């Protein structure tokens, strides 16, 4: 069966580095880190006091105020980012067949802060007093549902709950506390040393929030309407470590196999890849295993390609990580700029690739990879190709 070519024609994001693609990408190019003190709740009794929060987000800029009140924060992020992406793609949805327009938006946890608030309300006033919007605001698939409703998209609508593309907001006492208890978060109080992927002094990730949306379009359709094309999606791989519920398989075996699957699907040789937007969380196991996986797949070429983790600037956006990093990878190919891994100061002998420490690179590459590796052993890898027009 002949594969139809798929291109990226629109981008949208809300994340700790900015509330639009232009604002965020400019900050990433400057190497600005979005990590800072948690402002959403009192951290006096919390070990972890830093997070990568979205700043100055006004849902009313893109969402009707009455509708926004019925949405959890993660859904607001998704709808705002989707509105930007569709506008960026210059799509006139009234001229499209809505049954041919799908909506796929992930969330790792959904409306966790709403769960906390309504649980406390239920305990204090009785559970019959919780908000009638509690369930629809909380469930993880509501980001995709609300985007489909807003734009009248009647094709497949789904929400894969893995380390995939979508929206997330779980900077809350319960969310941060849960990750703290499992020793996944870096407890430092220094924002410049908190999210430091591949650094020998890394001590866990920094929780973040946001959304990243990409408009994917069949090439012929995009060309027929004269759409701007950021990059082409040429391959995809997905598998499972089936090893441990939080730890990666030894040596990054599952992640390596996932990259091989994606390259095979793309019909691309490893030596053709010039950049990897790594999962790069800043935990000891993830970064060393991902580095080992890259070496296993690329051999000596691993030392020639550029690898970076934009989580050094955004923190770990959980279910939104893949979407936001997909936006950055598409822009890296489109603009010929590979973002840095900021705040990487102390080399780790186990992590000895070119992670573009503290300075990005003006470099045009033909192929780039974006990796996402999630709890439960979920692995996903997308291969992007530079669009030459």
Predicted ranges, named:
Residues 5-9, 33-37, 190-266, 275, ...:
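Condensing-enzyme catalytic core mediating Claisen C-C bond formation in acyl metabolism
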Residues 130-135, 155-162, 199-203, 305-316, ...:
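Short pre-catalytic strand/loop immediately N-terminal to key active-site residues, enriched for Gly-Thr
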Residues 168-203, 236-250, 278-287, 304-354:
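Acyl-CoA/ACP chain-elongation machinery
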Residues 78-91, 140-168, 206-227, 316-338, ...:
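Active-site-proximal alpha-helical scaffold in enzymes
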Residues 1-67, 220-232, 327-342, 385-389:
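ACP-dependent fatty acid/polyketide chain-elongation machinery
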Residues 8, 21-25, 29-165, 169-176, ...:
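Conserved beta-ketoacyl condensing-enzyme motif
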Residues 1-8, 97, 266-272, 302-303, ...:
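Flexible, low-complexity linker/loop segments at domain and module junctions
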Residues 22-27, 113-127, 177-189, 250-251, ...:
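A glycine- and small-aliphatic-rich helix-loop capping segment at beta-alpha/alpha-beta transitions
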């Amino acid at each position: 069966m002949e594969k139809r070519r798929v291109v990226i024609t629109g981008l949208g994001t809300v994340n700790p580095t900015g509330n639009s693609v232009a604002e965020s990408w400019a900050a990433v190019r400057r190497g600005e880190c979005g990590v800072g003190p948690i402002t959403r709740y009192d951290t006096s009794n919390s070990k972890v006091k830093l997070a990568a929060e979205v700043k100055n987000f006004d849902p009313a800029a893109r969402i009707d105020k009455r509708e926004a009140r019925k949405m959890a924060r993660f859904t607001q992020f998704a709808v705002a980012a989707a509105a930007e992406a569709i506008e960026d793609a210059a799509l006139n949805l009234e001229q499209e067949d809505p049954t041919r327009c799908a909506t796929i938006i992930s969330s790792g946890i959904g409306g966790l802060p709403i769960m906390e608030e309504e649980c406390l309300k239920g305990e204090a006033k009785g559970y019959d007093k919780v908000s009638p919007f509690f369930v629809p605001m909380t469930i993880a698939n509501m980001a995709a549902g609300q985007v489909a409703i807003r734009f009248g998209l009647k094709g497949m609508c789904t929400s894969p709950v893995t380390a995939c593309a979508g929206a997330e907001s779980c900077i809350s006492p319960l969310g941060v506390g849960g990750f703290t208890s499992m020793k996944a978060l870096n407890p430092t109080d220094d924002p410049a040393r908190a999210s430091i992927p591949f650094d020998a002094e890394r001590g866990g990730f920094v929780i973040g929030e946001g959304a990243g949306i990409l408009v994917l379009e069949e090439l012929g359709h995009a060309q027929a309407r004269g759409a701007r094309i950021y990059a082409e999606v040429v391959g995809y791989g997905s598998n499972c470590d089936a090893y441990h519920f939080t730890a990666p398989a030894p040596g990054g075996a599952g992640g390596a196999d996932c990259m091989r699957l994606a390259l095979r699907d793309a019909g691309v040789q490893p030596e053709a890849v010039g950049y990897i937007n790594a999962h790069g969380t800043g935990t000891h196991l993830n970064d060393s295993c991902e580095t080992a996986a890259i070496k296993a797949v690329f051999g000596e070429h691993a030392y020639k390609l550029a690898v970076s983790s934009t989580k050094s600037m955004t923190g770990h956006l959980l279910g939104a990580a893949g979407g936001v990093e997909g936006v950055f990878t598409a822009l890296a190919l489109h603009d010929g700029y590979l973002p840095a891994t900021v705040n990487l100061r102390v080399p780790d002998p186990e992590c000895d690739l070119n992670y573009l420490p503290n300075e990005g690179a003006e470099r045009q590459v033909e192929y780039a990879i974006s990796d996402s590796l999630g709890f439960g052993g979920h692995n996903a890898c997308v291969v992007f190709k530079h669009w030459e027009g």
